[in-house]
């Protein structure tokens, strides 16, 4: 059997079938042609109406857009007006400073152009184009430039000639010094060898007081075991100062150093001079000197009295600087005060380094000093022919130089008579010698000859000291720097150490006596310590990369390339007698280097601080000017190099200090937490009868508050333990007594914890908020409480009666007799009711306080 499925396909326009609620289909309605035409017309009309509505909507939208744009324009105009009004209300000083800064920058650019270009035709201020010059003007301008350059070249040539003359003068002077040193070395070595055999006999036979100075080549003045060094050699003895072969230095008794015109050459006391002593009798204590012992008198103040010392150790550093150590300072505090140093010459004339006693030496021309020195040299008993003044000057054919020289010679001839009268005055000769050596050293430093020449001299003297290292002095101090000038270069600072009578003391003032120690200097007068050892060597300290300004405890140091400036402050520290007594038992043999021993507990006064800051600002300005002159181009295009680098304390190159950053960060954190916590504490003060007290904390980034209740608002029998609130950066701690503690970072949790502490105290001690003078307590709550109390009083009281026969109950209320001993008032229910209501009021009050803190 075949299975088929037939599917009927409906026509394209099937009739609309209508059915009723039962699903029965209505017969289809056939539409006539006229009705169909009317239906089509209605559809077309409806379509037109829809299009018209769309057009109207579009027009309305366009109108609305135009209105919105106009409104936006009006709002924009109002905004611009408001902005203009706000700009007009801005402080005019801001724009003034901006214009001022722009003007300053433009002025610096103009200064740079003027300084760097120097040609007016290349500076165009008003326009980019420039009218060409006429040929005649160009010719005149070129001619003017050529003449100006020729004049500049002539000036440079004249300066070079003058500089060459001075350099030749300096070189000749230095060579003269060197020749004298060589002659002295040769003479002392030969004479030491010749007199070796005679030394013991002479030393044993000589005794008595000091004798007079000997002549050239002969036996000098005889002291206690001391003989002049003219022809026999130095003998260490009682200190008779003999004539030194015409050079007049004299023996330093007990030390063995022979001062030759201020240069400590060293006596022949070792293998050559040891046999000279014999049993002639050396005074006790004189054999303690060694090659590094320096005769210098210094002292310090202790309990108002001045204590003198005489020993100082001399040593040389790796860079050639001199270190002078004072071993007998009893305590470190004595360095805080000025260490007074008294330099003595061989005639016991003392020169103090006190600032009040320092006087500026008169400026005398170099030729005058040279001739005066030569004149005094002629008066001394010198074996060698003295050097004439002309030997230190180069031969030149310059007429101007000859005229100047003739004028100086005429002036010298007029002054020589006055000088001859005072030629035997040791103080005058010593002063002239100091000036002469200072002038020569300044010339050497000016042309930077000092390091090379004096380094050779130091090596030669060191060889002398090593060859005769047994009991001879290493040399005098290199120089004393007083107020910036080198005074007394090469001077012997020994003095009369040994006893006995002194003999003739002659002086050598020739400028050809060299300085055997150049690098180390004393800085006397301006320093806070009184004697700071400073190495003034431009070739060693050259640093042109940056400027360093160092503020130490005692002074300000400025290093700007080869420009080194030291400014000291004399601090006045109050002396503690207890500390002095405790420190007197310290080891007196400890070497105290003045270079590094500065007190770390110096407290400057406001006046001293202001003075230091004023000096620092002044120097900063000067260094800025130096930088501006030195590198205009670099300063103009690299603004970070305008200000010098400032380093306080020590010389380091660290961009940021971690300790400072950490401290600033901790302080900022603490301030943030402090402000948040203080808002909560203000709410407590406003709503509760508390007393808030702030106490200083141990650290900088911490605070401590103590919160207590006012006495009138608490139970005096059981007072509340104070609440301590400590803030350390962003950490908050609350402590009450020994058992209650809290630690968190949130101030709201902090407030809730403190409220719980206060609430528990109020509940435990039965304190109602109405009893406190609290602003936050509601008066309606108090009225409700009064109504509750009245209702309690109006309730009939219930009593317990006992079966005691003595009790009588009567119906009449007026005649009731109650035995109070047997009737108890049943008040437990009433007390519990009042207490529960009071607790409810306390809970309600503190709940409102917590809400206020949460919504702060």
Swiss-Prot record:
Residues covered by region (Disordered): 55-79, 371-424
Composition skew (Low complexity), residue ranges: 371-399, 406-420
GO cellular component: core mediator complex; mediator complex; membrane
Biased composition (Basic and acidic residues): 67-79
InterPro entries: Mediator_Med17 (IPR019313)
Stretches assigned to coiled coil: 41-91
Any one GO biological process: regulation of transcription by RNA polymerase II
Membrane topology: Multi-pass membrane protein
Keywords assigned by UniProt, alphabetized: Activator, Coiled coil, Membrane, Nucleus, Transcription, Transcription regulation, Transmembrane, Transmembrane helix
Location in the cell: Membrane; Nucleus
Superkingdom to which the source organism belongs: Eukaryota
A GO molecular-function descriptor: transcription coregulator activity
Chain segments annotated as transmembrane: 217-237, 251-271
Sequence similarity: Belongs to the Mediator complex subunit 17 family.
Protein role: Component of the Mediator complex, a coactivator involved in the regulated transcription of nearly all RNA polymerase II-dependent genes. Mediator functions as a bridge to convey information from gene-specific regulatory proteins to the basal RNA polymerase II transcription machinery. Mediator is recruited to promoters by direct interactions with regulatory proteins and serves as a scaffold for the assembly of a functional preinitiation complex with RNA polymerase II and the general transcription factors.
PANTHER family per the UniProt record, alphabetical: MEDIATOR OF RNA POLYMERASE II TRANSCRIPTION SUBUNIT 17
Subunit-structure text: Component of the Mediator complex.
Identification of the protein by name: Putative mediator of RNA polymerase II transcription subunit 17
The organism's taxonomic lineage, starting at the top: Eukaryota, Amoebozoa, Evosea, Eumycetozoa, Dictyostelia
Encoding gene per record: med17
């Amino acid at each position: 059997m075949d299975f088929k499925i037939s599917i009927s396909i409906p026509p394209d326009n099937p009739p609309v079938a209508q059915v009723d609620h039962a699903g029965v289909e209505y017969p289809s309605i056939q539409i006539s042609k006229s009705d169909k035409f009317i239906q089509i017309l209605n559809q077309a009309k409806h379509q037109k109406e829809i299009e018209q509505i769309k057009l109207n909507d579009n027009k309305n939208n366009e109108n609305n857009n135009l209105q919105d744009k106009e409104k936006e324009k009006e709002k924009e105009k109002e905004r611009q007006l408001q902005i203009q009004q706000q700009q007009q209300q801005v402080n005019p000083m801001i724009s003034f400073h901006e214009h001022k800064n722009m003007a300053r920058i433009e002025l610096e650019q103009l200064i740079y152009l003027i300084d760097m270009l120097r040609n007016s035709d290349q500076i165009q201020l008003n326009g980019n184009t420039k009218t060409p010059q006429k040929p005649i003007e160009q010719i005149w301008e070129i001619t003017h430039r050529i003449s100006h350059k020729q004049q500049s070249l002539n000036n440079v040539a004249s300066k070079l000639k003058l500089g060459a003359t001075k350099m030749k003068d300096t070189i000749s002077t230095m060579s003269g010094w060197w020749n004298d040193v060589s002659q002295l070395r040769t003479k002392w070595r030969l004479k030491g060898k010749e007199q070796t055999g005679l030394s013991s006999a002479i030393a044993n036979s000589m005794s008595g007081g000091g004798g007079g100075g000997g002549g050239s080549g002969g036996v000098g003045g005889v002291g206690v075991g001391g003989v002049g060094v003219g022809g026999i050699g130095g003998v260490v003895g009682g200190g008779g100062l003999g004539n030194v072969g015409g050079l007049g230095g004299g023996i330093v008794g007990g030390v063995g150093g022979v001062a030759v015109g201020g240069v400590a050459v060293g006596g022949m006391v070792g293998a050559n001079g040891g046999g000279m002593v014999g049993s002639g009798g050396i005074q006790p204590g004189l054999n303690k000197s060694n090659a590094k012992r320096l005769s210098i008198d210094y002292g310090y103040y202790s309990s108002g009295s001045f204590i003198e010392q005489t020993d100082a150790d001399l040593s040389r550093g790796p860079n050639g600087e001199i270190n002078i150590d004072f071993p007998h300072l009893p305590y470190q505090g004595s360095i805080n005060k000025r260490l007074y140093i008294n330099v003595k010459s061989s005639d016991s004339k003392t020169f103090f380094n006190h600032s009040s006693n320092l006087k500026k030496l008169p400026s005398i021309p170099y030729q005058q000093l040279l001739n005066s020195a030569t004149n005094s040299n002629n008066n001394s008993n010198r074996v060698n022919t003295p050097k004439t003044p002309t030997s230190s000057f180069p031969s030149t054919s310059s007429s101007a130089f000859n005229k100047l020289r003739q004028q100086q010679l005429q002036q010298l001839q007029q002054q020589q008579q006055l000088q001859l009268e005072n030629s035997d005055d040791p103080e005058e000769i010593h002063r002239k010698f100091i000036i002469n050596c200072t002038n020569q050293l300044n010339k050497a430093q000016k042309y930077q000859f000092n390091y090379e020449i004096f380094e050779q001299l130091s090596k030669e003297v060191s060889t002398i000291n090593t060859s005769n290292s047994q009991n001879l002095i290493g040399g005098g101090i290199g120089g004393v720097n007083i107020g910036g000038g080198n005074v007394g270069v090469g001077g012997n600072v020994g003095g009369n150490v040994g006893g006995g009578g002194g003999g003739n003391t002659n002086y050598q003032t020739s400028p050809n006596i060299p300085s055997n120690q150049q690098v180390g200097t004393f800085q006397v007068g301006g320093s806070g310590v009184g004697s700071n050892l400073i190495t003034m060597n431009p070739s060693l300290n050259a640093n042109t990369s940056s400027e360093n300004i160092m503020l130490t405890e005692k002074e300000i140091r400025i290093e700007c390339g080869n420009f080194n400036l030291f400014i000291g402050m004399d601090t006045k520290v109050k002396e503690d007698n207890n500390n002095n007594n405790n420190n007197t038992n310290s080891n007196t043999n400890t070497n105290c280097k003045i270079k590094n021993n500065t007190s770390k507990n110096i407290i400057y006064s406001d006046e001293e601080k202001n003075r230091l800051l004023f000096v620092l600002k002044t120097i900063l300005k000067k260094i800025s000017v130096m930088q501006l002159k030195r590198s205009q181009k670099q300063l103009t295009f690299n603004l970070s190099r305008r200000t010098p680098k400032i380093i306080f304390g020590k010389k380091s190159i660290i961009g940021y200090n971690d300790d400072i950053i950490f401290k600033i960060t901790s302080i900022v954190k603490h301030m943030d937490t402090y402000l948040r916590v203080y808002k909560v504490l203000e709410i407590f003060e406003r709503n509760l009868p508390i007393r808030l007290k702030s106490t200083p904390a141990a650290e900088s980034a911490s605070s401590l508050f103590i919160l207590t209740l006012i006495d009138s608002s608490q139970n005096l029998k059981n007072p509340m333990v104070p609440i301590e609130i400590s803030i350390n950066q962003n950490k908050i701690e609350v402590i009450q007594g020994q058992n209650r503690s809290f630690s968190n970072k949130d101030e709201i949790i902090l407030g809730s914890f403190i409220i719980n502490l206060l609430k528990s105290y109020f509940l435990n001690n039965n304190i109602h908020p109405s009893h406190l003078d609290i602003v936050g307590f509601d008066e309606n709550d108090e009225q409700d409480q009064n109504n509750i109390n009245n209702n309690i009083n109006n309730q009939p009281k219930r009593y317990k009666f006992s079966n005691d026969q003595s009790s009588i109950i009567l119906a009449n209320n007026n005649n009731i007799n109650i035995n109070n001993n047997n009737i108890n008032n049943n008040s437990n229910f009433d007390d519990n009711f009042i207490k529960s209501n009071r607790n409810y009021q306390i809970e309600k009050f503190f709940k409102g306080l917590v809400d206020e803190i949460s919504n702060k």
